[in-house]
């Protein structure tokens, strides 16, 4: 029979006979799920939009969204296509960022194609306090802007993704990125550039591979599970010949309920970052701070060649509530962090610590809200956020 829009799938490794398939397209694959008739595997699409609202001293108020469109067709791994769009605006700096990530199933047998892109405005900001484990914080006298760095970032990253049946994921790809730092007067970064003679604009090409394994009983508030990851990569400057470095970032986290009903959970995370070679920019250093490691400090508070931290939380589910939109659970948690960075030619035995806690809301494992207050030698740090995940 004729049918220009008809696809015929069958096993590549088996003997097949096809008759009268004029106009149809033939695709042979050994993928079991594709070749097996599954009447309950329907073609459908889902759309999800989650607002992101938050606050921390570095960003001020944050408003944004995370939108995901997923299509389930004949060939799924675990879906046929998925497009994710995200955007955020930061009121303290008037900066914004835009992101896109698309995934397309079975580009090569069980491998998916991922396309990712990111853009930040010229006044999007990160922090920089210098290189070293004992850098000083002058917020009390010079205010927070002194260590803010305005940086524009453009990134495009195509990758291949393989997923295992039990929660494993392997991604490998290349990246092209361009970054421009504004040498703002009366800020620490301007002094750093003048002292070190650094270039404020750079473009990089990179290759990386990342392995992740996740096995959690719940996505937003896990009571039992483990997550592990390993990222290995290499980046080279397109402008400065010989400027290149490699990096290794391992991580491991556990969630374990301490009572049978899962209301009391112990959670811990370990993460390290190793830069191999010395030819990296300050924004490529191994950094720890409020959003990655030490919740009582400012973002990117300490930067070095190597970093390590551990977070440990004790979480308690106080009460379950029924609302007109989603069933929600209210909980409280306390946490302790420790970590440090290492830099060549620095003799430091100091380990930084922070401690605190807060409240969280979990809405049907779809959306969470968090309010936290952590303390450190730099003083207290308050933050809250609404989004997905703990």
What are these regions (language model features)?
Residues 71-96, 104-154, 174-190:
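A subset of solvent-exposed loop/turn segments in beta-rich extracellular surface proteins, enriched
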Residues 60, 108-112, 165-167, 225, ...:
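Strand-connecting loop/turn motifs
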Residues 70-74, 86-92, 120-124, 179-181, ...:
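Sequence/structural signature of outer-membrane beta-barrel proteins
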Residues 2-114, 121, 198-223, 306, ...:
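Outer-membrane beta-barrel initiation region
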Residues 51-55, 83-89, 102, 113-131, ...:
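Transmembrane beta-barrel strands of outer-membrane/channel proteins
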Residues 208, 361, 379-390:
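Outer-membrane beta-barrel "beta-signal"
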Residues 41-47, 75-83, 133-142, 184-195, ...:
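Flexible, solvent-exposed coil segments and beta strand-coil junctions
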Residues 99-102, 128-129, 140-146, 193-200, ...:
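C-terminal outer-membrane beta-barrel translocator/porin domains of Gram-negative envelope proteins
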């Amino acid at each position: 029979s004729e049918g220009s829009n008809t696809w015929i799938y069958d096993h590549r490794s088996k003997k097949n006979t096809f008759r009268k398939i004029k106009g149809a397209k033939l695709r042979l694959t050994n993928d079991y799920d594709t070749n097996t008739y599954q009447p309950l595997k329907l073609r459908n699409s889902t759309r999800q939009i989650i607002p992101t609202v938050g606050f921390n001293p570095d960003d001020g108020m944050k408003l944004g969204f995370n939108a995901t469109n997923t299509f389930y067709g004949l060939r799924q791994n675990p879906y046929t296509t998925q497009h994710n769009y995200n955007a955020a605006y930061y009121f303290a700096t008037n900066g914004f960022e835009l992101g896109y990530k698309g995934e397309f199933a079975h580009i090569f047998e069980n491998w998916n194609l991922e396309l990712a892109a990111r853009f930040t405005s010229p006044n999007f900001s990160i922090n920089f306090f210098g290189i070293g484990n004992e850098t000083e914080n002058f917020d009390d006298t010079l205010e927070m802007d002194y260590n803010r760095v305005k940086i524009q970032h453009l990134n495009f990253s195509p990758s291949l993704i393989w997923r295992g049946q039990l929660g494993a994921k392997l991604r490998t790809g290349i990246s092209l990125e361009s970054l421009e730092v504004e040498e703002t007067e009366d800020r620490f970064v301007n002094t750093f550039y003048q002292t070190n003679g650094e270039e404020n604009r750079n473009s990089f090409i990179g290759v990386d591979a990342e392995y992740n394994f996740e096995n959690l009983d719940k996505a937003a508030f896990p009571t039992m599970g483990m997550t592990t990851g390993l990222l290995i990569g290499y980046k080279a400057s397109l402008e400065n010949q010989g400027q290149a470095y490699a990096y290794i970032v391992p991580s491991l986290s556990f969630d374990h309920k301490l009572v049978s009903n899962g209301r009391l959970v112990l959670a811990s995370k370990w993460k390290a970052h190793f830069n191999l070679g010395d030819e990296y920019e300050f924004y490529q250093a191994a950094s720890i701070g409020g959003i990655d490691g030490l919740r009582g400090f400012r973002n990117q508070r300490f930067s070095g060649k190597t970093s390590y931290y551990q977070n440990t939380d004790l979480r308690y589910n106080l009460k379950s509530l029924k609302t007109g939109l989603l069933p929600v659970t209210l909980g409280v948690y306390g946490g302790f962090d420790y970590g440090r960075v290492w830099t060549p030619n620095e003799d430091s035995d100091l380990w930084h610590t922070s401690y605190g806690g807060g409240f969280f809301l979990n809405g049907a494992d779809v959306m969470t809200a968090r309010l936290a207050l952590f303390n450190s030698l730099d003083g207290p740090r308050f933050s809250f956020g609404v989004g997905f995940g703990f």
